[in-house]
From Swiss-Prot:
Organism per entry: Saccharomyces cerevisiae (strain ATCC 204508 / S288c) (Baker's yeast)
Topology term for the membrane: Peripheral membrane protein
InterPro entries referenced in this protein's UniProt entry, alphabetically: FAD-bd, FAD/NAD-bd_sf, Ubi_Hdrlase_CS, UbiH/COQ6, UbiH/COQ6_monooxygenase, UbQ_mOase_COQ6
Transit peptide: 1-17
Function: FAD-dependent monooxygenase required for two non-consecutive steps during ubiquinone biosynthesis. Required for the C5-ring hydroxylation during ubiquinone biosynthesis by catalyzing the hydroxylation of 4-hydroxy-3-(all-trans-hexaprenyl)benzoic acid to 3,4-dihydroxy-5-(all-trans-hexaprenyl)benzoic acid. Also acts downstream of COQ4, for the C1-hydroxylation during ubiquinone biosynthesis by catalyzing the hydroxylation of 2-methoxy-6-(all-trans-hexaprenyl)phenol to 2-methoxy-6-(all-trans-hexaprenyl)benzene-1,4-diol.
HAMAP family assigned: COQ6_monooxygenase (MF_03193)
EC number: 1.14.15.45, 1.14.15.46, 3.5.-.-
Record family assignment: Belongs to the UbiH/COQ6 family.
Protein name: Ubiquinone biosynthesis monooxygenase COQ6, mitochondrial
PANTHER family: UBIQUINONE BIOSYNTHESIS MONOOXYGENASE COQ6, MITOCHONDRIAL
Note: Present with 2940 molecules/cell in log phase SD medium.
Impact upon substituting G202A: Accumulates ubiquinone biosynthesis intermediates lacking the C5-ring hydroxyl
């Protein structure tokens, strides 16, 4: 009897020790929450940096990154996906040189400028520079970065990607010490204790909530409608077209060969209509939006909503009205100069919409925490700067961490992180403010405002130094 009690007690003790061991947190130097472009770029850049490569790095994402990204990189589809962004040559250079990614260049299109028009007037702004920007699928960036990270040995190179896993809790390892290392609990039951926690986890960032860093901003009560398009022929000029309509800007941006991508900002009601239309009607409206007047477009919206115009009649009417506009041009070649190539079809299942908003965190860091990308800021897509801002955040954070390592500092301390925030916040704030003011300036057809912006746009188009400053900003070459 005594022997049985001893053995039972021993089993309980052994079980208790095993439980304590399994629940002990795993240590990591950097834990990145989010496997989007910003998070993957940061992980790859840390491993590619001579100063940072020995840091134990862990990336967590709720999506199945391995299957999704590996499949895309090894067997890409024969069509372009709808999540396509404009990136600067500087961002491409950083991805390939600092992060070590091998991008799929046959799925990237550089272009030589942007032709901007006001839908309420004849004002134009022709921004031209060779290889000013590139259009690239977000999944191309992610898959290329994931492929690079996969080439590292998990144990030897101290890099782990934990996908299909959510962050369920973040807290300080010592509740009474804000400088203590964060404890991150995952949905798979694992707990990590990290020297530096990086939030690359989007607009609703759990990392930002843990850091208690306030974020300010507003919803625009507008949506961006995206789609991948097939064109009648490749562009005569490799450039993007953007037209500011009273309901919001519409952008037609080139992809390889006779492909293009659409971003059409509109009201919630109009965005629902655009998604509900048959593909042929939607295609016809895109072509009309770059040529016809606002009154014509409003007429089409009304008749489509009340069902009084079918697809065939819509296509016929738009063709008639656009041909009338083309007939007023002095030269037939002006059609290709002023208007984008006609859209002939929409790639199946690429139409989607997303809400538009502006947000900006008060800070990008505190002790043990840094924020990058959408966790720190979101912007209207009209300036095409969202992803570039995130990539520049990562560049700034990597540089700050390298300097901290060179000086023997704790990479999770505010002393190490604040140079990153001090560098990135002012530039991002300017870009966010610029996009917000442009949206509000062009989101009206009030005659005095239209007259003022028409004068300003035409004047800007005539002043070379001002145009060059805009091109430098859009192209990521701002000083």
């Amino acid at each position: 009897m005594f022997f049985s009690k001893v053995m039972l007690t021993r089993r309980i003790l052994v079980r208790g020790l095993a439980t304590a061991k399994s629940s002990a947190p795993k240590l990591t130097d950097v834990l990145i929450v989010g496997g989007g472009p910003a998070g993957l770029t940061l992980a790859a850049s840390i491993k590619n940096s001579p100063q940072l490569k020995d840091l134990k790095t862990t990336l967590v994402d709720m999506v199945d990154l391995k299957d999704k990204l590996s499949d895309f990189y090894n067997s890409p589809p024969d069509y372009f996906t709808n999540r396509i962004v404009s990136v600067t040559p500087r961002s491409i250079h950083f991805l390939e040189n600092n992060a070590g990614a091998t991008l799929m260049h046959d799925r990237i299109q550089s272009y030589d400028g942007l032709y901007v028009t006001d839908g309420c007037s004849k004002a134009t702004l022709d921004l031209a520079r060779d290889s000013m920007l590139c259009m690239i699928e977000i999944i191309n960036i992610q898959a290329s970065l994931y492929n690079r990270i996969s080439q590292y040995d998990s144990k030897k190179d101290s890099i782990d990607i934990i996908d299909n896993t959510k962050v369920v809790n973040i807290k300080h390892s010592d509740p009474n010490d804000p400088l203590s290392w964060p404890l991150v609990t995952l949905s798979n039951g694992e707990v990590y204790k990290t020297r530096l926690l990086v939030g690359a986890d989007g607009f609703n960032s759990p990392t930002r909530r843990f850091s208690q860093i306030p974020s300010r901003g507003w919803m625009y009560n507008a949506y961006g409608v995206v789609a991948s398009m097939k064109l009648e022929y490749p562009p005569f000029k490799l450039r993007g077209w953007q037209r500011f309509l009273p309901t919001g800007p519409i952008a037609h941006l080139p992809m390889p060969e006779n492909n293009a991508t659409l971003v059409w900002s509109s009201s919630e009601r109009l965005s629902r209509l655009l998604l509900s239309l048959p593909p042929e009607s939607f295609t016809a409206l895109i072509n009309a939006a770059f040529v016809l007047e606002d009154a014509d477009m409003n007429y089409y919206y009304r008749t489509l909503e009340d069902g009084s115009m079918d697809t065939d009649k819509l296509i016929e009417d738009i063709k008639f009205r656009t041909e009338e506009i083309y007939a007023t041009l002095k030269d037939e070649s002006d059609i290709d100069e002023i208007y984008p190539p006609r859209v002939v079809s929409i790639i199946d299942k690429t139409r989607a919409r997303f809400p538009l908003k502006l947000t900006h965190a008060d800070r990008y860091c505190t002790d043990r925490v840094a924020l990058v990308g959408d966790a720190a800021h979101t912007t209207h897509p009209l300036a095409g700067q969202g992803l570039n801002m995130g990539q520049t955040d990562v560049h700034g954070l990597v540089y700050a961490l390298e300097k901290a390592m060179e000086r023997g500092l704790d990479i999770g301390s505010s002393l190490s992180l604040e140079p990153f925030w001090a560098e990135r916040y002012p530039s991002n704030n300017v870009l966010l403010g610029m996009a917000d003011k442009l949206f509000k300036l062009y989101h009206t057809n009030f005659p005095p405002v239209v007259a003022l912006r028409t004068f300003g746009l035409n004047l800007t188009n005539k002043i070379g130094p001002v145009k060059n400053m805009i091109i430098d900003t859009l192209g990521g070459n701002e000083k």
